[in-house]
Amino acid sequence: MHELGITQNIVAIVLEQARGASVKRVTLEIGKLSAIMPEAIRFCFDICCQDTLLEGVTLEIIETEGKGKCRHCGHEIRLSQPFGQCDRCDSFELDIIQGQELQIKEMEVEELCV
């Protein structure tokens, strides 16, 4: 389960960027072609956040659709797996242009007024 290592890195990045501030919500963007299971990330996130400043933080996951672009005719198609066939010219030569991403999209941080 490579999601544990990925989640440990996500937690480390969020803690570093928060600089001690109270984080309320973390939003991740995970592509459907990334071979990363969102539910496994969610499970690992809860475990990795235990006994840290992130314990109890809300995790939101946005899954992005897979898209490919045909190398022959330039047509864009939806992909549910990292390969496919152009529905315009029947070519199998596609470049994946969306759906492999994993990024921390947003962090909601509570600012303290002093």
Curated annotation (Swiss-Prot):
Binding residues for Ni(2+): 2
Gene Ontology biological process terms from the UniProt entry: protein maturation; protein modification process
One Pfam family hit: HypA
Binding positions (Zn(2+)): 70, 73, 86, 89
Gene3D superfamilies xrefs: 3.30.2320.80
A molecular-function term among this protein's GO annotations: nickel cation binding
Key word Metal-binding present: yes
InterPro entries linked to this entry: HypA/HybF
Keyword Metal-binding: yes
This protein's UniProt keywords: Metal-binding, Nickel, Zinc
Top-level taxon in the UniProt lineage: Bacteria
Family per similarity comment: Belongs to the HypA/HybF family.
Function text: Involved in the maturation of [NiFe] hydrogenases. Required for nickel insertion into the metal center of the hydrogenase.
HAMAP family with a match to the protein in the record: HypA_HybF
NCBIfam families: hypA
Protein name per its UniProtKB record: Hydrogenase maturation factor HypA
Gene (UniProt): hypA
